[in-house]
Curated annotation (Swiss-Prot):
It comes from Danio rerio (Zebrafish). GO terms for biological process: cilium assembly; establishment of planar polarity; limb development; nervous system development; regulation of smoothened signaling pathway; vesicle-mediated transport. It comes from the Eukaryota. Residues 165-253 form the PDZ domain. Keywords: Cell projection, Cilium biogenesis/degradation, Cytoplasm, Cytoskeleton, Developmental protein. This is Protein inturned.
Length: 915
């Protein structure tokens, strides 16, 4: 079966391989292998399992190896007990017999805290983790008498559960040393004597040892996780590994002169702090790093028992326990007075307040629900007051999705560790997001606040052929007509009904088969647990998340909205499976058409395996999606630095690597390279959409003679439009539309040189979408939100990075900051709706704000010419809200040289958008 791609080349339909992937589904369905995540299922049925890929594992193991010194212990085995003997203990035993070697039961010895592992369960107690004989006791000295400079530590990931796939003959021949570790040891000569050294004579292909470049043939295995091993006890030591875990091997080798074993380890990259935090590690360290920052989350009860007066009896939950939070907790009486007594007296609704604490301004947000009050305080330097309520609403909705209600979530004592983990992630994202997001540049505060606060998910447009294949694969999975998921298989009801699913790639939503409200519930959970940036930055070998959820669309259902129909009384579960950069979220329903769920159901391996098979089926589309991410931006974007005169830009700007520009310059033979820039773009130094810089001649107003003296961007005019015919400000749209059009060369206008291009090249050039009208492209940035579908489109991170310069990053920052204020004005202009009650009549006489804009002036900060003033570039940031026929919000940033109609831009962006 063949079809045609968007560029005209033949494309073999992916449907031809469906039978092959059906066989994969069958293999996974009827496989007897035990899932690796089975041991991490908690008592309440929830599961949070994260396993890194091979590359991330090597970085993690290298870090673990670097953080531990070479220290080994001796172990003496008996039938039911094991004795750990250190050199210090042996010396004491030889000197006197006053102290005997202390014997511990195997279960107590095995109780240890696992090192950073690829398998972690959310909120699981360390005492419930698999035990291990490989214990590193604090205060023990090295116990292997060898030269320190000849020792090296390497870490490998061992999984005893995979032994079932190893043939019995190989396991019997080499034992666990070959079957589990992959090391071939052939006793002979002096090494074959009882208790001799374990010399590595070979490595089994595809084994854990062969994947580690530090393990070489000829090395001697001295210790396994600080336990001295010989040919006599190696099988006993390896048999004590209870489950999948990292094991540190101490090897004796001959190092070349001048090369230390730690040289390669120190150069290994560090594991993302986000991964360690998701595993439940480093929470104390991260919390201590912001202990001096005033912040707190408290759940207070307004129902106080006057008979039994107790200290802090109104505090149901508090996080964190620090000195700064203690000062906020001490003034909780003010919070109770504002939100309870004052509200009862005035009848108003208190949503936020501000106070000074330790020379810092702190914003406090409130959410009152029945007789309970949720209080969240954050520093004003991290969260603006106009965005605080959006943050509170996001937290409340996420907690309701997870626990059904705030009272149910905070009142249950068992949820306290999970809530601590939740708020640890929450405050880390607000106060120090750079610790979680591994990036070369500091995350933009206002950019993340604005985009994360939108009631929508970031959408990535795909070519039609790839989009069709993705939707087809998801529809095949959601049909549930295979194996145990079919009613005809056993003649009984299936366990769950798949209500829908959504698919992410590197944090971008590429397919959605969920209703809007369910999509927002799922994405809020993924956003608060940082699952979207996790899949974007790292290749995940396996991610499995399972928990019961309470979709808000069903919790707040209204029977009058759909007469004659009511939602079934069912329970809902969220299944998230990640594989490499793909992540699929599935919403399941138990009850109604499916069997009723009893107790606390655990994840069913059949459903997990089928989602994995779906992601494996989509893996072949990886190259096409990456090509879309690396393609030039559509619509075309301009860099703000291109609109500065030549003196305001770096003199090192040269002709870039634009495909059309390269073909154009190859077709035309100019007299000199400098002539190319002057003939095409009027000035030397021009670059294409991803690197080409234009130098249009600006008018006197852009030359900087009448600009501001400071080097920071300044807002010089504000543009408002009330209703359909509201009047503008002093420099509003009236003066804006009458502004004379500035004539200067367009870096995207080829003119008569178009004739030198071939017919196909001309067609490709015409396919480039330009949103702005006229011959020039003056669009710098945009965000379009489709409220009905719950998505928004914006330039990708790659597209933003390509448009770098001295002014453009500051322009993007101003755009995000300004959009926060514009959207707040939009929300305040809408008819006021009490979030906890019925709709109330609006008091605004002129109707809702439909358009709002701010005019900025920007100057380069690296201006060194003292004789001439710095050039000034002016641009607009305009927001447009459309209520009819389809609710939309459109934010755009463009140069002031052209009078654009934002609604026309929004129409061009959304026209033909298939979701």
């Amino acid at each position: 079966m063949f079809s045609t791609c968007s560029d005209g080349r033949p494309f073999q339909s992916f449907s031809t391989n469906l039978e092959d992937f059906d066989s994969i589904r069958s293999v996974l369905l009827y496989s007897d292998l035990e899932p690796e995540w089975l041991d991490d299922v908690q008592k309440n049925g929830q599961l949070f399992y994260l396993e890194l890929s091979d590359g991330e594992e090597e970085a993690l193991l290298a870090q673990v190896s670097a953080n531990h010194s070479a220290a080994t212990n001796h172990v003496r085995f008996s039938e039911k007990e094991a004795e750990i003997i250190t050199d210090n203990a042996k010396r004491q035993a030889n000197s006197s017999n006053k102290s005997e070697a202390k014997l511990k039961k195997l279960t107590k010895i095995l109780r240890r805290k696992r090192r950073p592992s690829q398998r972690k369960a959310e909120g699981k107690d360390s005492s419930q983790r698999p035990a291990s004989i490989l214990k590193n006791q604090a205060g023990q000295r090295p116990g292997v008498v060898v030269q320190q400079q000849r020792l090296k530590d390497v870490c490998v990931y061992l999984n005893p559960k995979r032994l079932s796939s190893v043939s019995s003959s190989s396991a019997d021949r080499g034992g666990l040393l070959e079957a589990l570790l992959g090391v071939v040891h052939r006793p002979g000569g002096n090494t074959g004597k009882r208790g001799g050294k374990l010399i590595i004579h070979g490595l089994i292909p595809h084994s854990p040892a062969s994947k580690c470049a530090e393990i070489l043939i000829g090395d001697a295995l001295v210790a396994v996780d600080d336990v001295e091993v010989t040919s006599e006890n190696i099988e006993r030591v390896l048999s004590c590994i209870p489950g999948p875990m990292q094991v540190r091997l101490t090897l004796e080798t001959v190092c070349p002169a001048g090369v230390s074993p730690e040289s390669k380890v120190s150069a290994s990259p560090q594991v993302s702090q986000l991964v360690r935090l998701l595993w439940g590690e480093d929470t104390i360290e991260l919390q201590m790093s912001i202990a001096d920052v005033p912040h707190i989350a408290m759940f207070l009860s307004l129902r106080l028992d006057s008979e039994t007066q107790q200290d802090e009896q109104e505090i149901v939950y508090q996080y964190p326990q620090s000195e700064a939070s203690a000062q906020l907790k001490a003034v909780r009486g003010i919070f109770l007075t504002l939100c309870d007594m004052l509200e009862n007296v005035t009848g108003g609704q208190i949503i936020s307040s501000s106070l000074w604490l330790q020379q810092q301004l702190v914003h406090v947000g409130y959410w009152k629900e029945e007789s309970n009050l949720l209080v969240i305080a954050v520093p004003a330097s991290r969260v603006p007051l106009l965005y605080l309520q959006t943050v509170i609403e996001g937290v409340v909705r996420t907690l309701k999705v997870m626990y059904g209600s705030l009272d149910r979530g905070f009142s249950d004592v068992e949820n306290a560790p999970r809530l601590d983990h939740f708020f640890c992630l929450f405050f880390q994202q607000l106060i120090q997001p750079s610790r979680l997001i591994h990036s070369s540049r500091t995350p933009d505060l206002y950019g993340s606040l604005f985009l994360d606060g939108l009631p929508a998910v970031r959408w990535l447009t795909l070519p039609p052929d790839i989009k069709v294949e993705v939707d087809t694969v998801l529809s095949d999975f959601e049909s549930s007509d295979f194996g145990d998921m079919s009613e005809d298989f056993y003649g009984m009801r299936r366990l769950y009904v798949i209500l829908g699913s959504c698919l992410f790639y590197k944090g971008y939503l590429i397919a959605n088969h969920l209703p809007k409200e369910d999509l927002l519930d799922v994405c809020l959970y993924c956003q608060h647990y940082c699952l979207l940036p996790l899949a974007s930055e790292q290749r995940v070998a396996q991610l499995v998340v399972w928990r019961e959820v309470f979709p808000q669309r069903r919790e707040t259902r209204n029977s009058t909205a759909h007469p004659g129909y009511c939602q079934p009384h069912a329970r809902h579960f969220l299944l998230i499976v990640g594989l490499r950069h793909f992540m699929q979220c599935v919403l399941l329903e138990a009850g109604g058409c499916a069997s009723s769920a009893v107790g606390r159901p655990t994840p069913d391996s059949v459903y997990v395996d089928q989602v994995k098979a779906t992601l494996l089926q989509l893996e072949s589309l990886d190259a096409g999606i990456e090509e879309r991410l690396s393609a030039p931006p559509t619509p075309c974007l301009s860099c703000a630095d291109w609109f500065l005169p030549a003196g305001g830009r770096s003199q090192q700007d040269t002709i870039g690597s634009s495909p059309i520009l390269n073909r154009l310059t190859a077709a035309i033979k100019p007299p000199s390279p400098g002539g190319i820039g002057r003939s095409l773009f009027g000035e030397a130094g021009t670059v294409g959409i991803r690197g080409r810089r234009a130098s249009p001649q600006r008018s006197q107003s852009d030359s900087g003679s009448e600009g501001h003296a400071d080097g920071t961007p300044a807002s010089v005019a504000r543009r408002d439009s009330l209703g359909s015919g509201g009047s503008d400000g002093s420099l509003g749209s009236a003066g804006f539309l009458k502004m004379p059009r500035l004539k200067h060369p367009n870096p995207f206008y080829l003119g008569s040189l178009r004739k030198s291009l071939s017919e196909r090249e001309t067609e490709e050039m015409q396919n480039v979408l330009q949103v702005t009208a006229g011959v020039e492209n003056t669009l710098f940035h945009y965000v379009l939100m489709e409220s009905v579908q719950g998505i928004f489109i914006a330039p990708t991170h790659t597209e933003i990075r390509h448009l770098s310069g001295s002014i453009h990053p500051q322009l993007i920052h101003n755009f995000q900051h300004c959009c926060l204020s514009i959207r707040q004005a939009f929300q305040q202009s809408l008819p006021t709706r009490d979030r906890r009650g019925p709709e109330r009549q609006s008091t605004a006489g002129l109707g809702p704000v439909k358009e709002h804009g701010v005019l900025f002036q920007c100057k380069p900060q690296n201006w060194t010419d003292q004789k001439k003033p710095a050039p000034t570039m002016t641009y607009w940031v305009i927001g447009r809200m459309l209520l009819e026929p389809v609710p939309q919000e459109f934010y755009v940033c463009f140069h002031d040289s052209v009078a654009e109609v934002p609604v026309e831009m929004a129409f061009r962006l959304s026209f033909g958008l298939a979701v």
